[in-house]
Structures are given as C-alpha cells and as structure tokens.
Amino acid sequence: MNEQYSALRSNVSMLGKVLGETIKDALGEHILDRVETIRKLSKSSRAGNEANRQELLTTLQNLSNDELLPVARAFSQFLNLANTAEQYHSISPKGEAASNPEVIARTLRKLKNQPDLNDATIKKAVESLSLELVLTAHPTEITRRTLIHKMGEINNCLKQLDNTDIADYERHQVMRRLRQLIAQSWHTDEIRKQRPSPVDEAKWGFAVVENSLWQGVPNYLRELNEQLEENLGYKLPVDFVPVRFTSWMGGDRDGNPNVTADITRHVLLLSRWKATDLFLKDIHVLVSELSMVDATPELLALVGEEGASEPYRYLMKKLRARLMATQSWLEARLKGEKLPKPDGLLTQNEQLWEPLYACYQSLQACGMGIIANGELLDTLRRVKCFGVPLVRIDIRQESTRHTEALGEITRYLGIGDYESWSEADKQAFLIRELNSKRPLLPRNWEPSNDTREVLETCKVIAEAPKGSIAAYVISMAKTPSDVLAVHLLLKEAGIGFAMPVAPLFETLDDLNNADDVMTQLLNIDWYRGLIQGKQMVMIGYSDSAKDAGVMAASWAQYQAQDALIKTCEKAGIELTLFHGRGGSIGRGGAPAHAALLSQPPGSLKGGLRVTEQGEMIRFKYGLPEVTVSSLSLYTSAILEANLLPPPEPKDSWRHIMDELSVISCETYRGYVRENKDFVPYFRSATPEQELGKLPLGSRPAKRRPTGGVESLRAIPWIFAWTQNRLMLPAWLGAGTALQKVVEDGKQSELEAMCRDWPFFSTRLGMLEMVFSKADLWLADYYDQRLVAKTLWPLGKELRDLLEEDIKVVLAIANDSHLMADLPWIAESIQLRNVYTDPLNVLQAELLYRSRLTEEQGKSPDPRVEQALMVTIAGVAAGMRNTG
C-alpha cells in the first residue's frame, strides 16, 4: 500500500506543480502565492494547528471579489487532477490490487478450493452470468464533457510517464502535452452555461460507450476468457457476452416534463445512428485486415463467383454498404424527413451477426484461428453486447400518471371514475379489458395533453424495433393495479409481445408491501400467462433512505428482496431484482463487491440489473481499463454470491435489525419531519437553494415546484448535505439506534453480526466511509456564518449526535480509527481534504455574501455567483460524489 500511495502522491504533486505554473502564467505570481499560502494553511489546519485554522478562515473571508474565482478554480481544478491521478492508479500496475482484473483469478481459485464445488458447477455459474448496467442521467455528473475528455488525455500522459523505459526526449514531449492539457482545462469554463437537454444527456451516454465501453467490453471478455482457460480449462463461447447496457437517458420521464414521446423517438434513432457509426469503423478495419483467400465451401457458396477471390473482404464490403445505407436513412429520419425504408435496412442484431460469424467459422476451419480471434472476435462480441440499438432504453413513468390517464378514459366513456375506484374494482376492470378483444380507447377522442403524452409514449414503444426498449419501470408503484394499468395501456398501443414491466418500490411502506403486491399479481392467471415465468422488480434505494433514513431503508430493502426471492422461487418464477442505487451512501451506494455480497441469498440467481448514475459512470467506466476493472469486480461478486451465498441471518439478528429499524426511523423522522426548526436550518446551513442555479441535468430538482423536504428529490437532498460536510442523510438515526441496542446489553451480538453477516458489516462499513468524509468543524463553520443564532442549538445537537455515532460504530466494529480496513480510501480522503477544506470555507463565505446581497435587494455580483458554482463543483470533486 505504501508503494502504491507514494506513487499516487508523487503524481498528484507533479500535476499540482504544473497547475501552479499554469496559474502563474495566466494570472501572475501574486495569485499563485495567495493559492499556495491558503494550501499550506489548510494542510497545517488539517494537522490540528488551531492558529493556522483561524488564519485560513480570515484569509478566505478577506479575499476581494476579484480574487474569489481564481482561488476557487485553483482548488477545484486541483481536485479534478487528483481524481484523475487516483483513477489512473486504481488500474496501473502500482495501483490498488482489489481493482485489478486479477480479482477474477482470485475468485476462481477461491471457488476451486471449496470442497463442495467442482469445475462443472463453476462453469455452469459462469454460463448463467448476467449483468445489465443501466446508465442514468441523474444530474450528479457535475463535470463538463469537454473537461472529462481532457482528463482522459491526462490519464494517457500518466500512463506514458509510468513507463520506466521511456526515453528522455519522449518524456519531455509527454510533459509538454501534459502542460498543454492542464492549460486548456484552466482556460475552459468548468460550469455549463445551460442545462443539458435530454438529448444532450443521451449524447453524453453515447460518448461513454464510444470512448470507453466499446473497447473496454471486448478487453474484459478477453481477460475473463484467459482466466477461465487458465483456471478451469474452459473457453467462453463466441456468442457469450454476459454484460449489456441500457439507458434511462431519453426514456426516464418521471418528474421530467422535458422527456416527451418525441424526445424518446429521437433518442432511439440517435442511438441506432451511433451504433452504425461505431460498427462502420469496425468494418473498415476488418475490410483492411481480412485479405485472406482460403475459405470453407460454405463461405464460398455465400459470396458466389463475384466474391471468390477475396471472400472475407467481399462479405465485409457488403455489410459496410448496408451499414452506410442504414446510417443515411437514420440521418434523414433525424432531420425529420420521411423516407421509405431501404432494402437491407439493419433493424436486428442477427443481420450484423450472420456475415461476421460466417467469416469467423470459416477462418477457424481453415486453420486461421489466430486471425478469427483478433479484431473480428471483438466485433462479434460488440454485436452481442451493443447490437443495432447500441444501448437499449428503459421507459420510466410515475404510477399516478397512468391512473390519471385511465381515469380520463373511463370518465369519457361514462363508466365511472377509475381514479376513485377501490383496488379490487380497478383490478377487475383491468383484467376484463386485458382479456377483451375490442379496443378500449374511443375513436375521435381528444385527450388532455398529459394523457396524450402517456399514450404517445406507449405508441413509441410499439413502433420501436423489437429489442430496443428494455423495460417499462413504474416509479412509486404501490398496488397490483399499477402494474396491470401499464400492461393495458401497452396493449392499447398495439404491443404484441410481453414487454417487461417493472414496479419500482421506493418508500418504506411500499418496500414493506412489495411481496404482498407481487403475490397478488402472481395469483392472477392472465398475468402468470403473460410473463412466461420471468419477473423484474425494481428496489428503490434513494427515496426509501430519504423517507426513513439509511438504517430503516436498508433493512426494508433487504427484507423486501428476501421475501420476493422466496415468493418467486415458490411460484417457479425467475426473478430479476433491479437495484436503483445512487453513488452516494445516502442513496444506496457501496463498493460493488461488498454491496452484492451483502444482499439476501439467491438475490443474484436471475442476474444483476443495477443503475449506474451520474458521476459514478465516469469513475467506474470513464476509461477502457477502468471498465475492465469494474466489470471484473461485478463478475467476481456475482459468481461468489451465487456459489458461496451469504448465510441466512439468525432470527435473533433479524429481531435486532427490526429494533434498529424502528428506533432509527423514529429518530430520523423526529428531526426531518417533526422538528419545526429542521427545514429552516437545512435551507440556511446548506446551499440547497443555490443548487437550483447549477445547470446540471434536464430534470427539475423537485417533483412539485412547491413543498418542503418531502417534495425535494433524493439527489439535491443528498447533494446539499454533502456540500456542508455534515453528510446527514447518510447516517442520521443509525448511530442512535445502535447506541440504544448497546445500552440494552446486546453489544456482543452486534459484534457477531458485524463479523459473520455481510449485510450488517457492509452497513457499518458504509457508515465509516461517510464519517470519514464528514467534518464537524466545517459543518460548525457553515452554521456560524450562515445560520440564525436561534437555530444554532439544532446544529450543535446534530454534530454531537454525529460524534456519538462515530464512537459507537468504531466500538461495534472493533476499529481504533475510521476506515482501518480500507487504508487506500482513507489516505485518498485525507489527500483531498487539504484542497476541499478551503473550498468549503470559501463556499460558506460566498453563500454569506450572495444571501446578504439578496436581502439588501441588490443585483447579484456575477463574480460571487460564478465562484460559488465553482466551489460547489469543487467540493463535489473532493467528496467524489454529489447526490
């Protein structure tokens, strides 16, 4: 670890030095001196020097409005560079071992050493691997795409500099390129001027595919194949690709009026266009490479006399022509032109697969396996992973929108008001209509705009090429009728196949009722016939934690999954659990390996489907090497969870979790819902109101424009508390509950749970991570600078609670200090703190100046507003997550 960390520190220091030179060139020595003074004071403050801490506060408070932005940008950009270096070191030879693809080899060796597992069982588990990653446009990716691209280039420079054989003149060239990139970043505005549209967000997703996943996925499969061959003597079949990508960008309309049916239609076309573009590049390479003459009779028959001299090239050129014709047609459609479909339009993956696989088989049969297993194999695997759609799209809509649409229809037909019917009456009506052969929608009927939008969305699904829409997710699902309603609306749109419809259970009550809802659905004969033995259910992490606090929410999530697994197993249904996790702890985020092994036994039998959100997409899939690492971690965790499932918790442990859940929920809600001072305190102690000015995502921060904390989305709720370093949503209630159980004489039982139950140990580990990022003196400083004195007691109470929570968690985990088991992460947080602290202090000062200007009725100072936005972005970089 020391060697790894010293290499990271060395690179961070080098990048910081280059940034300093850039600042000096751009703004002069005096600004660099000011930044250096602040950095040294921050470092000394972190080491416990109280006098230097006070001097740091005074220095930052006394900055002139002209100095605010350069200082904020200096520390913010440094943190982005530190994150780039850290990402590189997680995949470099000197980097963290646990992030290396070697993790698969270690898992396979561990499995082979189990007396009750043989190679055939492990092979079967590999063959049933299924991983679907759902990229979402949650507005937590605060870094602009142009800067992300430059960071990727900086990463390449670090890789070249790491080469011990690099010649001096080459090193000089790389350093010059590094200086150019850092100067480009400095002279680029890090804050977007406008909110991205849903189409912009979709394009960002396609850029991730092009720049990283396109190469990362075949590389991961080569690595997996190599490890399987070495450890099991087993080769992956050519058509076996266990990973798929889906996107919510352009499909998630829950609370986002900007995502319309037309937008979804446009994004589907755009996605197909991007797929043709990427496959064309692959085929250009194959046309160049596959110049061989020898071919099987089958391939020669396929190409005929015309292609006999260069059969492989001939087939590739024909495929290239089809791709070009398809791309031209898609371009015309995107421009709004109505053109007839050309002959050979590519709409299905088989059209791509067949000519490529014919070449592969012929090369293998003619003794040219080494060529077949080169670029051609990579392209075949891309066809299986990405295919014609590139990424499939999920449609997500809130349950009440479907209820309102059906209410409007039934009122128009004069058969009553669907919205006011009982659940039993709704189900009876829906099942009757689902079995009916006549249409429900009246002709020449003019629905309201909202209802038209719901119906148009269903029409888009019906028109889309089969396989381009992955699932229909119903947010805030509460009852069986919520699921049946969507099936009816899809039937009315003319969808002739069983579209996967996934209810999303996301509040505490809904999670507790999830099993009952699914049991009722599975008891309906029509429904059982429709789903053909497969069911997807989405578990909401963000909103349940916001509703009840992390401890109660995580236990409700565990119990809901456990009950659903057992119900579906009993009914002979293959269940896919879809995890709606965020990147932050308060939204269910946890290291992938730990998170998966902490789920109930059997939860991964139907594969893993999980959201990858916002800034986590960049951290986990921003580079091809990082993609290989992340997919390897998921693979090893799924194999381990399925072959060495965690133990069923003892009844006594379940009872303790029930107790912890009740106490933590009461404590959490006691503050968040019932304390009259809480909302005013939240609004003043955090930049919650100012976050709305940041042009992050296309989705509004609130589900409804008015209302308090309950109407705020989970992301800005977490984002705000992360900024002031209290991190409140990620721990409030948990420590109080643990302390109460300890006082009841159950500490030894809690220690046993921590040792022997992955679910509980992961919860404590996540709390330790949060505590490491929280900071009492900074949270206190926000109060002193921004909060009315009448609210100070509440702030002190919360900070005292946090301090007590840290003590009780350390006692149960038997740790002397936080993150004792993860020194790399602990060191990383400490490294960034020196640069994040000044941004926090500066942010509090800027919030004070901005709010004072507003109170005085003056126009906002653009220098203050811009610097404030930069501190928000900088703190997000320092915390490594936003919402």
Curated annotation (Swiss-Prot):
<dbReference type="GO" id="GO:0005829">
    <property type="term" value="C:cytosol"/>
</dbReference>
<comment type="function">
    <text>Forms oxaloacetate, a four-carbon dicarboxylic acid source for the tricarboxylic acid cycle.</text>
</comment>
<keyword id="KW-0460">Magnesium</keyword>
<dbReference type="InterPro" id="IPR021135">
    <property type="entry name" value="PEP_COase"/>
</dbReference>
<comment type="similarity">
    <text>Belongs to the PEPCase type 1 family.</text>
</comment>
<dbReference type="InterPro" id="IPR033129">
    <property type="entry name" value="PEPCASE_His_AS"/>
</dbReference>
<dbReference type="GO" id="GO:0006107">
    <property type="term" value="P:oxaloacetate metabolic process"/>
</dbReference>
<dbReference type="GO" id="GO:0015977">
    <property type="term" value="P:carbon fixation"/>
</dbReference>
<protein>
    <recommendedName>
        <fullName>Phosphoenolpyruvate carboxylase</fullName>
        <ecNumber>4.1.1.31</ecNumber>
    </recommendedName>
</protein>
<dbReference type="GO" id="GO:0008964">
    <property type="term" value="F:phosphoenolpyruvate carboxylase activity"/>
</dbReference>
<keyword id="KW-0456">Lyase</keyword>
<dbReference type="GO" id="GO:0006099">
    <property type="term" value="P:tricarboxylic acid cycle"/>
</dbReference>
<dbReference type="InterPro" id="IPR022805">
    <property type="entry name" value="PEP_COase_bac/pln-type"/>
</dbReference>
<dbReference type="InterPro" id="IPR015813">
    <property type="entry name" value="Pyrv/PenolPyrv_kinase-like_dom"/>
</dbReference>
<feature type="active site">
    <location>
        <position position="546"/>
    </location>
</feature>
<dbReference type="Pfam" id="PF00311">
    <property type="entry name" value="PEPcase"/>
</dbReference>
<keyword id="KW-0120">Carbon dioxide fixation</keyword>
<dbReference type="GO" id="GO:0000287">
    <property type="term" value="F:magnesium ion binding"/>
</dbReference>
<dbReference type="InterPro" id="IPR018129">
    <property type="entry name" value="PEP_COase_Lys_AS"/>
</dbReference>
<feature type="active site">
    <location>
        <position position="138"/>
    </location>
</feature>
